[in-house]
Amino acid sequence: FVQTGEKSDIGENLTTNIKNSYRMGAELEAGWSPLSWLTVEGNAALSRNVIKDFDEMASVNFDDSFRKIHYNHSTLAFSPSAILNGFLDLHYKGIKTVWHTNFVSRQYLDNTENITRSLPCYSQTNVNISYSLRPAKRLIGLKEAIFGVNLNNIFNRHYAASGGVYSTILDNDGHPNENRYTQLGFIPMAGFNVMGSVAVKF
């Protein structure tokens, strides 16, 4: 199901089933432990997400009238072609530190594959530090206590992971994309932040 560009009576985006579309890709994963206290891992999801034939119903002059615009072989909305993750895991006795960097490629906000209506690619890094304490003698039945701290987005990247688009044709004469008003909305993600946690096992 994909959004057509039309709205319901209460303003919700209408969707339709696109028969001539496909998603094709591969997932890769690898890991390596060169030392007893060090593990390196990575994974990648690579895909192609295509609508072979798509009709956008674009509003005209902010009105309830629509104009059909046809697209051939456009990319499905919110479908990045690459998602990459890398992990560096250092662990010694009860102390564990995990460095995680991820990358997400460009995502289009609608099915027109218009670069002006897209989320730029982004990358961000988190670090998780934890310490596991197992008392020699159980205290009130306590088996283990894990103290953790998450350092999120440590490089304070400014990026958006989701968003939306509203577009209307201002002049119904001529090419529909030459005189078009577009309004973008982005959902920004948090900058650098710290979270702590405590987990207990009985």
Roles of regions detected by a PLM:
Residues 112-117, 142:
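Short, surface-exposed loop/helix-turn segments at secondary-structure junctions
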Residues 32-34, 43, 124-133:
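Transmembrane beta-barrel strand/turn architecture of Gram-negative outer membrane proteins
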Residues 105-108, 131-202:
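C-terminal beta-signal and adjacent terminal beta-strands/loops
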Residues 22, 80, 121-123, 143, ...:
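Residue-level preference for beta-strand/loop junctions
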Residues 1-2:
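Glycine-rich phosphate/pyrophosphate-binding loop
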Residues 39-41, 85, 92-98, 126, ...:
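Outer-membrane beta-barrel architecture
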Residues 5, 10-111:
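Gram-negative outer-membrane beta-barrel transporters
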